Amino acid sequence: HLDRLPRVAEEVLAPEALAERLTGATTPFVVRGLAADWPLVKAGRQGGDAARDLLAAQARNRAFPASIGAQAGDDRLFYDAAMAMNFRMDMGPLPQWLAAMAAAEADATAPTVYLSSIDMGDYFTGLAEAHSLELGARQPLASIWIGSRTCIAAHNDVPDNVAVCAAGRRRFTLFPPEQFANLYLGPLENTPAGRPVSMVDVRAPDFAAHPRFAEALQHAQVAELEPGDAIFVPSLWWHHVEGLAAF
């Protein structure tokens, strides 16, 4: 059903035109190839190993937090039947997690490994500087998400987001802020990553359990990103993010 949803609008923008386009922007849009010249994008085109090598070479010598899936073959980082998390948090050096991701590419039963919202300046040397966007006077938070093939439930964020797919492929399914009542949000005090998430499996919705989600789908948009593509996700827009490739 996601393939039948309207596509997020695409715009042709030079990197230097992004800051002006973002001023006052309140609806999502995609820019193909905005970050095509990023070193990580170029490495990713050579394959997962090249992208992982670049990240490992610039990682600081410190422990990185990672989410490790508890159930083999389950790519959703979500709740289990008892409303506990279906993953555990662990700390370790980045090469350890990258090796686990590489192993997962060859083994469909390997647990999901996901590093979420890692501050590029705190955890890497030179990575943020080499992978920036021209945002004018804005002082953005620059974070990176690294993982094996994962599926992240619909959630929202307070800041505006410009998300770039640097390696692999991603599918974003977006819902406007006012659709919160039709997304069946989970408990506010018990969340996978600090923000309430939709209890609906967007890829395979159970309309008997979540009948109002049919209304949310009437307002949904979808975008599939290739390496170097970027999407603007406005403040408070709900976004469900799915990895479509191994890394």
Label each PLM-derived region with a short phrase.
Residues 1-230, 238-247:
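N-terminal accessory scaffold of Fe(II)-dependent oxygenases
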